[in-house]
Curated annotation (Swiss-Prot):
Keyword Heme: no
Residues annotated to bind Mg(2+) 4: 834, 836
Region feature (Carbamoyl phosphate synthetic domain): 549-930
Annotated binding of Mg(2+) 3, by residue: 822, 834
Record field: catalytic activity: hydrogencarbonate + L-glutamine + 2 ATP + H2O = carbamoyl phosphate + L-glutamate + 2 ADP + phosphate + 2 H(+)
UniProt gene name: carB
Name of the featured protein: Carbamoyl phosphate synthase large chain
Region of interest called Oligomerization domain, as start-end residue ranges on this chain: 400-548
MGS-like domain ranges (all copies): 930-1051
Native source species: Saccharolobus islandicus (strain Y.N.15.51 / Yellowstone #2) (Sulfolobus islandicus)
EC class: ligase
Binding site for ATP 2: 709, 748, 750, 755, 779-782, 822, 834
Complex formation: Composed of two chains; the small (or glutamine) chain promotes the hydrolysis of glutamine to ammonia, which is used by the large (or ammonia) chain to synthesize carbamoyl phosphate. Tetramer of heterodimers (alpha,beta)4.
Sorted UniProt keywords: Amino-acid biosynthesis, Arginine biosynthesis, ATP-binding, Ligase, Magnesium, Manganese, Metal-binding, Nucleotide-binding, Pyrimidine biosynthesis, Repeat
């Protein structure tokens, strides 16, 4: 090392959004650890309250502020760091850092960029500069021309020749990018593409239809030494965003010449941008010959590098941080192996498969086709010793109700070959399920290749699974050898039992009798070729012996959160990591079972033992058989653990904390409602939907609107408010499809009520609780609501009643551990709507707001009891904390933005303040694309709900300095109106600074809302929130920028 900075500022990525997720919690946490090892003081700016890194143990100073240049400048001014790390917070961090550089902030305060410099970042992320840099270095790129206007794009597309790929500079998740087959396609979408570029630039590139896409991950130090860490092969061809693609590592279809040529190009790309640290390089390969092009590079930690790190066992983020400090590769020890230096390139004796997870069914009008823009909200990673085993495991990990590639709902559906091929041509999510269906219905390899462009190598493997499964179906009994082969091909007990028309218990019994059990294998980055010490494992049937001996003692298995989806995100990983740390005081050994490559919990130095494998009853029982775990904890990882808790208990597994039977009562809407009646606790009127006659009778008694609520679901899946009979019957039909095993509950929807929650822990007798109040009225899903601590509008009387209700439930259900209760409060009377006997989505926020870790307290409650004398205790608040949702509307092509009882947000941000409005505005500004409107600009304010709030919002915005229009079809008293057509024109012309609306008005204002989000215009979808934010605008000059401890928060 040449020099060691005394204080380093690390820029986080802010709230989770599509294409920028928990991988930056993992990479940022590793960077902070690497800095701490050097004795360097660390300062972190990140508004993502749900992350592990925004805990005090990672950074010396934590600022929960918007990740924008002017807020970061305030931190630099106060903290005076001498170095800044910008490669661990995604595209958000890079954009902010380029702004800080261009505005002279870094130079003014003498802050040195550590790692790849700004000019290298601009060479990589400006499509024009990247193209020029590649050509200067004789590196192959596709025919292309850049453009900064609609006219230039149309002109250059004619030169390049259709079809063209439109790539967007300084951009996240391919937002705004597209394939244009004709000039008409280009004209229709180019304005949106330019709007989504941070610098207003696009690249018009020749579209390489059905070419293979590959990625290489490379490390490079200051001396130019390089190590290529991984080669990742996309199964989806060019034209599908790599974040949307199913991928495998190592590459399966390259010959040595192809592999080595692209490896050499990768090192040359890193050299051309003077990389210091890590980057990924993406290639297009012609499947019909030795022709390849370099597509792009990301000079930072990325989603791919997180995957590569977990796939290989090579700690990319940690090593990258060390290289940024000036170390050379040979000077850094790979802490996963504990034996080798960072210049050793990993060797794999297994196959990793990554599959994205989509939640598109939650969004109306969304384009379901996979394309150049990323729409998936999470991903899973499986490890196996054959492609078939790895792929089938990954399909189960998706938790979409499919038992593997074959044998599930799609495989057994009434669907012809023609229909299956049509779905494949449309590039629907989870295409491998439709490939299997097409083969089952008689399609050939060539027919499927023609519509998909997927390598025949992979198609043959999937066809082999179909053929094997169809053979299984004609057997009456299964012999030992066939069963062994089925397990090696990745078939679950459930799949095998379905094929044989037997029970899963029957299959498990035969396996036990024949000693057909999985073996535990280590991931050591070296394929066992070098002695190593590692705690990173997976299970496979393609092996004969375990790679380790199992210890005895008091051991705990923690079930992780699995792949992220709407409603399950990084907040549950925070709970898992918190539980790991808290449980280590009570157990000899704590192991984690999880399969999400993005997370901190699946990192090499967090868990004593990490099993990177499936989360289901079969796998947990396999692990208990080997490890003899005394307890299994299912309460920290969200819904996936709760959904298997009861079955685990029925199989003799001891659950840590609250019993599976109590969880079942809380999760089953009908059982829970009956319990509330028994305890005399108020709830909205309800009925179990066992027949349409009962539903009609109930609705005649209580009247519309009513809420349709399925059981055992997360994030309000298929939860809808029905205002008419037609809507009601449609929602009931959907709910029974989502949760067919359980009854649907219809309840009276209480209008104009306050929604509030209690996050807490109990020892079965006493409760530690934290009250959260929603800004939006009841009816907006809690995951999409803006939350305040302490409460503002609730009366003390209402809160005391809520506390009494919570205490009654805790004692009746013998709650031991964490829980969350949701209320609607009308006329000072609280009505319970939901109880979750697990860690909640809001628990990181409530814990950090009050300065008390609820998961730590949960462990105390379980083992020692809560250590206070009161029956119910709520810690005091020193200042204000507000949590805001992050939506990803712009990524979800075509969807209609609106709020309701089904969750739509992908992440959350929080901030602290000396007043409610101080905390609210910083929290709201932390979610993209929210910003302070430019004065003298235009705002649109309209809607059919919360009209008084909308009118007051308009008044506040006028005071702030905006010209405010309502819409003549939905006028607000005293506010100037324009017609809908004029409003649409203003939005398209980018003259509107913000849109505030309320209600479900799709037939009326679809174009206004959709165009606004496509053009990065802030949209507020609730009148009450609009009022509070507009009021906060008026106090913009009094925002505070303190470190979290000064607000009395943080843990």
């Amino acid at each position: 090392m040449k020099e060691t900075p005394k204080k380093v500022l690390v820029i986080g990525s802010g709230p989770i959004k599509i294409a920028e997720a928990a991988e930056f919690d993992y990479s940022g946490s590793q960077a902070l650890k690497a800095l701490k090892e050097e004795g360097i003081e660390t300062v972190l700016v990140n508004s993502n309250v749900a992350t592990v890194q925004t805990s005090k143990k990672f950074a010396d100073k934590l600022y929960m502020l918007p990740v924008v240049w002017w807020a970061v400048e305030k931190v630099i001014e106060k903290e005076r760091p001498d170095g800044i790390m910008i490669g661990f917070g995604g595209q958000t961090a890079l954009n902010v850092s380029v702004d800080l550089h261009k505005k002279g902030v870094l130079q003014k305060y003498g802050v040195k960029v550590l790692g790849t410099q700004i000019d290298g970042i601009e060479k990589a992320l400006s499509r024009e500069k990247f193209r020029e840099t590649m050509i200067e270095n004789n590196l192959p790129v596709p025919p292309s021309l850049s453009a900064r206007s609609e006219e230039e794009a149309i002109k250059n597309a004619k030169i390049v020749g259709y079809p063209v790929m439109v790539r967007v500079s300084f951009n996240l998740g391919g937002r705004g990018s597209m394939v244009a087959w004709t000039e008409e396609d280009l004209k229709k979408n180019i304005r949106r593409a330019l709007s989504q570029s941070y610098i207003g630039e696009v690249l018009i590139e020749k579209y390489l239809y059905h070419w293979i896409e590959l990625e290489y991950e490379v490390m490079r130090d200051k001396k130019g030494n390089s190590s290529v860490i991984a080669c990742i092969e996309n199964l989806d061809p060019m034209g599908v965003h790599t974040g949307e693609s199913t991928v495998v590592a190592p590459c399966q279809t390259l010959d040595n010449l192809e592999y080595q040529n692209m490896r050499t190009y990768t090192i040359e790309v890193a050299r051309s941008i003077n990389l210091i640290g890590e980057c990924n390089v993406q290639f297009a390969l012609n499947p019909r010959g030795y022709e390849y092009y370099i597509i792009e590079t990301n000079p930072r930690m990325s989603r791919s590098s997180a995957l590569a790190s977990k796939a290989t066992g090579y700690p990319l983020a940690y090593v990258s941080a060390k290289l940024a400090l000036g170390y050379e590769l040979h000077e850094v020890i790979n802490k996963v192996s504990g034996r080798t230096c960072a210049c050793f390139e990993p060797s794999l004796d297994y196959i990793v498969t990554k599959i994205p997870r989509w939640d598109l069914s939650k969004f109306e009008n969304v384009d379901q086709s996979l394309a150049t823009e990323m729409m998936s909200v999470g991903e899973v990673m499986s490890i196996g010793r054959s492609f078939e085993e790895s792929l089938q495991k990954a399909v189960r990990m998706l938790d979409i109700g499919e038992p593997g590639v074959v044998g599930g709902k799609i495989y057994e559906a009434k669907m012809s070959k023609v229909e299956a091929l049509k779905y494949l041509k449309e590039r629907r999510p989870y295409w491998f399920l439709y490939v299997a269906k097409a083969f089952k219905e008689g399609a050939t390899i060539d027919e499927v290749y023609e519509v998909t462009g997927i390598s025949k190598f992979f198609l043959n493997k999937i066809k082999g699974l179909v053929d094997f499964y169809e053979t299984l179906k004609i057997l009456k009994e299964i012999d030992e050898e066939t069963l062994k082969l089925a397990k090696k091909l990745g078939f679950s007990d459930e799949q095998i039992s379905k094929a044989l028309n037997k029970s899963t218990q029957y299959v498990r019994k035969i396996r036990d009798q024949s000693n057909i059990i999985p073996v535990v294998k280590l991931i050591d980055t070296l394929a066992g070729e070098w002695p190593s010490v590692t705690n990173y494992m997976y299970l496979t049937y393609n092996g004969t012996e375990d790679d380790l001996e199992f210890s005895q003692g008091n051991k705990l298995l923690i079930v992780g959160a699995g792949g992220f989806r709407i409603g399950v995100s990084v907040e549950f990983d925070w709970s898992v990591v918190s539980l790991m740390e808290a449980a280590s005081k009570y157990f000899d050994e704590v192991a984690v079972l999880n399969y999400n490559p993005e997370t901190v919990s699946t990192d090499w130095d967090i868990a004593r033992k990490l099993y990177f494998d499936e989360i289901n009853v079969e796998r947990v029982l396999d692990l208990i058989k080997k490890e003899k775990f005394r307890y299994v904890a299912t309460f920290s990882g969200g819904q996936i653990g709760n959904s298997i808790a009861k079955e685990l208990e029925e199989n003799g597994v001891r659950l840590l904390g609250t019993s599976g039977s109590s969880v079942d009562i809380a999760e089953n809407r009908e059982k829970f409602s009956k319990l509330l009646d028994k305890l005399g606790i108020s709830q909205p009127n309800w009925v179990s939907a066992t027949s349409l006659e009962e539903i009609k009778k109930f609705v005649n008694e209580v009247g519309f609107p009513v809420l349709v609520r399925p059981s055992y679901v997360l994030s309000g899946s298929s939860m809808k408010i029905a205002y008419s009979e037609e809507e009601l019957y449609e929602y009931v039909r959907r709910a029974t499809e989502i949760s067919p095993k359980y009854p649907v509950v219809i309840s009276k929807y209480i209008e104009n009520a306050i929604e509030a929650e209690v996050d807490g822990v109990s020892d079965g007798n006493r409760v530690l609780g934290i009250t959260l109040e929603h800004v939006e009225e009841a009816g907006v899903h809690s995951g999409d609501a803006t939350m305040s601590i302490p409460f503002r509008k609730l009366s003390e009387n209402s809160v005391n009643k809520m506390r009494e209700n919570v205490l009654s439930l805790a004692r009746e259900l013998n709650i031991k551990g964490p829980f969350n209760v949701q209320f609607v409060v009308k006329d000072n009377t609280p009505h319970i709507i939901e109880l979750n006997l697990r860690a909640s989505r809001s628990m990181p926020f409530s814990s950090k707001a009050k300065g008390i870790n609820l998961i730590n307290e949960a462990m105390k409650a379980i083992f020692n009891g809560l250590d206070f004398s009161e029956d119910y205790y709520e810690p005091p608040s020193k200042y204000w904390a507000v949590k805001s949702p992050q939506f990803s509307w712009s990524q979800l092509r075509g969807t209609y933005p609106f709020l309701g009882p089904e969750m739509k947000s992908t992440g959350e941000a929080a901030s602290f303040g000396v007043t409610f409005y101080d905390a609210l505005l910083k929290s709201w500004l932390s979610s993209i694309p929210n910003r302070i409107p430019n004065k003298n600009g235009i705002a649109l304010v309209y809607g059919d709900k919360n009209l008084d709030y909308l009118k007051d919002t308009a008044v506040n915005l006028v005071k702030f300095g905006l010209t405010v229009y309502s819409i003549s079809e939905l006028p607000l008293q005293g506010i100037e109106t324009i017609d809908k057509t004029k409003a649409e024109e203003l939005v398209r012309a980018k003259k509107v600074e913000t849109v505030v609306t309320d209600g479900y008005l799709k037939k009326f204002d679809y174009n206004i809302r959709r165009t606004a989000v496509d053009y990065n215009i802030p949209v507020i979808l609730n009148g009450r929130l609009g009022y509070e934010v507009s009021k906060a605008f008026l106090d913009y000059d009094s925002l505070t920028f303190f470190e979290i401890s000064e607000y009395g928060g943080g843990i």
